[in-house]
Curated annotation (Swiss-Prot):
Residues 1-19 form the signal peptide. This is Exogastrula-inducing polypeptide. The EGIP peptides are factors effective to extrude the archenteron toward outside of embryos. May have a role in the induction of gastrulation. It comes from Heliocidaris crassispina (Sea urchin). The keyword Coiled coil does not apply. One of its GO terms (cellular component) is extracellular region. Disulfide bonds join C52-C65, C59-C75, C77-C90, C111-C124, C118-C138, C140-C153, C184-C197, C191-C211, C213-C225, C256-C269, C263-C283, C285-C297.
Length: 325
């Protein structure tokens, strides 16, 4: 009798749990339905798809008229456009409107006029990607950037060019990567004997195989390893320096002053406006001084003005270690 009672209670308990789960599911569905109904009631619906398209100017070209749950037609906008306005059409949210409008123009003639023919350093072309799709925008020549204050093309600074070169190198590495260690060894002649195929754990090549070249060698056009030039070593030294500066940057002015003892009295903490340290505070050292290990300012050693090859290779190895982390 006791066993039967226990079984009865267990069955009843399971039924209650199932009923609660069913009830919860129904409540969730009802809530979603109410939210959808409320959203549709706040929009101006049309009886037909054609009526919706006419009244909303085809959703301003940034969406499609679709039928809602009550039979009315509404604009379904393409992100980041949203339904708004008295006619319930598609509009760019105010917070994203300004920067897009600076760059984009409705016609090629307007683009050329407003940007002074892209300042002579680019061409007005029809954009086919992202928020600017279907509008005209300056495509700037190499060495120039966009947008400036009116959407034209301004010269890139030397540091910007260095940074963009680094990004281009990252993309190049992605194209050199292979899906397997066998494919990597075969296609690169085992890294030309100056490296080895390893699985990448960083950046766009993560999970693929790429030649990890020995010190003094770099990936060549087909992904193998060729000797580095002196100029390439200088360039990577600069990249390593950027990494070092990033580790020295502080989030606030007081923190920068405190941690560096006011730049050791030989500089001042300023907000960085470029590269990885943008928006953070870092010591800008006086002439004849340079950032030390903790981010302050120490006198430059004249003997260090000409860095020897061994030092460059040390920086290169440090960079490789940073990228592997």
């Amino acid at each position: 009798m006791k066993v039967s009672l226990v079984l009865l209670i267990a069955v009843f308990g399971l039924a209650m749990v199932a009923a609660e789960e069913t009830l919860e599911s129904k409540l969730q569905m009802a809530l979603k339905s109410l939210l959808q109904e409320n959203e549709e009631l706040n929009l101006e619906g049309r009886d037909t798809k054609g009526g919706c398209e006419r009244a909303t100017n085809n959703c301003n070209g940034h969406g499609d008229c679709v039928q809602g749950r009550w039979g009315q037609y509404y604009c379904k906008c393409t992100l980041p456009y949203r339904v708004g306005g008295s006619e319930s059409s598609c509009y760019m949210p105010k917070d994203k409107e300004e920067d897009v409008e600076i760059e984009t123009k409705d016609t090629v003639a307007r683009c050329e006029r407003d940007t002074k023919n892209c300042d002579g350093h680019g061409t007005c072309q029809l954009s086919t990607f992202g928020r600017r799709t279907g509008q005209y925008i300056c495509f700037c020549d190499a060495g120039y950037r966009k947008p400036n204050s009116y959407g034209g093309c301004s010269p890139s600074s030397a540091r910007e060019l260095e940074y963009l070169s680094y990004v281009a190198r990252d993309v190049e590495m992605e194209m050199l990567a292979r899906d397997s260690v066998y494919q990597c060894n075969r296609d690169t002649n085992s890294c030309d004997g100056f490296g080895k195929c390893e699985k990448s754990t960083f950046g766009r090549t993560t999970g693929q195989y790429i030649c990890n070249c020995d010190d003094g060698y770099r990936n060549n056009a087909y992904g193998g390893c060729s000797p580095r030039t002196e100029r390439e070593i200088e360039y990577l030294s600069m990249i390593a320096r950027d990494q070092e500066l990033e580790m020295q940057a502080r989030d606030s002015l007081p923190q920068c002053n405190r941690d560096t003892n006011y730049c050791d009295g030989f500089g001042q903490c300023v907000k960085s406006t470029f590269g990885r340290t943008t928006g953070q505070y870092i010591c800008s050292c006086n002439d004849g001084y340079e950032n030390n290990l903790y981010g302050g300012c120490s006198p430059k050693d004249n003997e260090d003005e000409e860095v020897d090859t061994d030092r460059k290779m040390e920086i290169l190895r440090s960079l490789a270690n940073l990228l592997e982390e």
